[in-house]
């Protein structure tokens, strides 16, 4: 580990998930900033939030995003690469997938009436092969 990684681990709370991990970098009542690290060949659930918007900034690597403003049947796949940004508004379905052999790092800015992990509806998980 580099000294910057050791400092980050000491300063910020890390949470592990099946798709990777994230650090909570900053938090206020209506705002939260995270660093998401999506591991190679992993992905998140196809999900939406009712009380918050999210802005994603890809800081390292690239990923695919399944995205729909309304229904799962209308989803589109887009690719995000380093320094790309993407806006997900509340109630819009979204899923990050990393099909590559290297990590994808994303700075996620959440803002809205509620910025906690309970504000989520999942349609399906990454490993369900949809």
Model-derived regions: residue spans:
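Classical nucleotidyltransferase
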Residues: 1-18
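A short glycine-rich, His/Asp/Glu-containing loop-to-beta-strand
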Residues: 15-53, 109
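Conserved hydrophobic/aromatic beta-strand scaffold that supports enzyme active sites
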Residues: 33-37, 55, 77, 85-87
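Short glycine/proline-enriched turns and hinge-like loops at secondary-structure junctions
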Residues: 48-50, 57-58, 80, 98-101
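Short acidic-glycine-tyrosine-enriched beta hairpin
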Residues: 69-93
